[in-house]
Amino acid sequence: MTTAAQIPGLEAAPTKHARLVAWVREIAELTQPERVEWCDGSEAEFDRLTSLLIEKGTLVRLNDEKRPNSFYAASDPSDVARVEDRTYICSEKAEDAGPTNNWMDPAEMRVKLQGLFEGSMRGRTMYVVPFCMGPLGSHISALGVEITDSPYVVISMRTMTRMGAPALEQLGEDGFFVPAVHSLGAPLESGAADVPWPCNTTKYITHFPETREIWSYGSGYGGNALLGKKCYALRIASVMARDEGWLAEHMLILKLTSPAGKVHYIAAAFPSACGKTNLAMLIPTLPGWKAETVGDDIAWMRFGEDGRLYAVNPEAGFFGVAPGTGEQTNPNAIKTLWGNTVFTNVARTDDGDVWWEGLTKQAPGHLTDWKGRDWTPESTEPAAHPNARFTVPAGQCPTIASEWQDPKGVPISAILFGGRRATAVPLVTEAPDWRRGVFFGSIVASETTAAQAGAIGKLRRDPFAMLPFCGYNMADYFAHWLEVGQKADQAKLPRIYYVNWFRKSPEGKFLWPGFGENSRVLAWIVGRLEGHADGVETPLGVLPTRDALPTDGLQIDEADLDALLTVDIDVWKQEAELIPEHYQTFGDRLPAALWAEHEALVSRLDG
């Protein structure tokens, strides 16, 4: 076995952080790489690594005239998405992981990982990637170091985080960091040929909440391999937030300026495929309103000295789903992707650009699909994988807010929760207090089957849009939200709203046009925050009056508008009957306050 002293580059650590240096040495001895590189995040390093990846066949440089400094990657067809069934929360006690997470005894998992990681980087370079989640120097930010044997991960981390020398400098000689180890699980024996996308059929994405560690094996794909994203910024950070009294959330952050010049910041949590990025990059249809982007996916929120809740976007880039993103749905995203972008599992055009379903109304006559095959509009499979991605610097977004890197964060005025609901849930409902808002967050769901008229389809619950990302028992997470609200100055807490852009008629037609028209709902919310928009009390909460929701210039049927702005008592009685089954999943750890909210809803519906 090679000792640490024999591994080139290991002793060249550009830091005096003793714990970091010792940990890197320990992982090098375990994984046995050919050499170690300490990443500085420089442009020269990026250029060197992209050239290496082109040489290996992992990346293809796109046409510089069409897409400057941009690249295309195609993954192994077995490695295309997050692997929820291989994602573990290894808390000391199983009950602390809770019923919504996979748990394994940490001692057992460590033995398993030890066996998998032993020699797993043989024949490869081990990269040490220091990074900062959130603006450098912010009291809301936190540091991490990822060790990886994937240069694709290194270049992606440079886009998605503040990576390299500045993060290492911030760490100093004894600063706290989350250690994150990633291996493709594809050691290269001497003289063996590599493949363009190395990975392993065995995959483990593991989190140790008490020790704040992340270990990921076998996947080179996004959320499994870019460990600053879901693994740190949500699963580990949610545990840190619980212990330290803050919030780490799966939320966009939007800056809204009214025609009167008043600014409000709004955070919103929606499950995937419910329009989070589209709302984050909203182009308002209402005259005089301006929307700007602070973040599209994750928010870290702490109370400031003035008692208000301040949020930062811990990421530095967007890791977005390409299919469905087009001029019609999200023109700002399309403008963001002009260059400096890595596209993964999209299709390639004959002139060296990229394409995916939804980019244009008509597909090109010929493409190379994500599996490298010829594709024409007559082909039976999509040209791009449905989870094809783009990785792009957030600063390129034309609507990026000037405050997006403000170390103080931005003060949140309102928090939105919502799922994809064809039935029951009105367009927008205001919670009368924080507790009702937490109740709304706890019951968020999307309908996975079509509903019959007057009935509810099959629901997939995704409380707070955190189901795949909460790093501890979700019942304790609800309790944490309730506690955060109890301790705060009630007058300064953000107001909470339950929204639904996806109501359908019995015939299956969307009742609300969505996209830029959602600015009308935001205008009513701002009106409520400022005390000049009317609402009507319902058993669910406060809904807009017909006159209070700005509908000028909107082509919408009166009956559809009525359905959007009504709480159907009979349907909501059915909805309320479905909640206990969801709550019982959490057993006696579910906060009594949420059962009380449910009982109060039932009694208001009966009233």
From Swiss-Prot:
Q: Which residues bind substrate?
A: R82, Y221, G222, G223, S272, N387, A388, R389
Quote the record's cofactor note.
Answer: Binds 1 Mn(2+) ion per subunit.
Name the NCBIfam families on file: PRK04210.1
Gene Ontology biological process terms in this record: cellular response to glucose stimulus; gluconeogenesis; glycerol biosynthetic process from pyruvate; oxaloacetate metabolic process; propionate catabolic process; response to lipid; response to starvation
Which GO cellular component term is one of those annotated?
Answer: cytosol
Give the Enzyme Commission number: 4.1.1.32
Entry annotation: catalytic residues: C274
Gene3D superfamilies noted in UniProt? 3.90.228.20, Phosphoenolpyruvate Carboxykinase, domain 1, Phosphoenolpyruvate Carboxykinase, domain 2
Q: What is the official name of this protein in its record?
A: Phosphoenolpyruvate carboxykinase [GTP]
- What is the protein's species of origin? Frankia alni (strain DSM 45986 / CECT 9034 / ACN14a)
Q: Which CDD domains match?
A: PEPCK_GTP (cd00819)
Q: Which cofactor does it need?
A: Mn(2+)
Keyword line? Cytoplasm, Decarboxylase, Gluconeogenesis, GTP-binding, Lyase, Manganese, Metal-binding, Nucleotide-binding
Reactions this protein catalyses: oxaloacetate + GTP = phosphoenolpyruvate + GDP + CO2
Looking at the record's lineage, which domain of life comes first?
Bacteria
Give the protein family.
Belongs to the phosphoenolpyruvate carboxykinase [GTP] family.
Pathway listed for it?
Carbohydrate biosynthesis; gluconeogenesis
A UniProt-annotated Pfam family? PEPCK_N
Q: Where does this one sit in the cell? A: Cytoplasm
Which positions are annotated as binding Mn(2+)? K230, H250, D297
Q: What does this protein do?
A: Catalyzes the conversion of oxaloacetate (OAA) to phosphoenolpyruvate (PEP), the rate-limiting step in the metabolic pathway that produces glucose from lactate and other precursors derived from the citric acid cycle.
Oligomeric and partner information: Monomer.
Name one molecular function that GO assigns to this entry.
phosphoenolpyruvate carboxykinase (GTP) activity
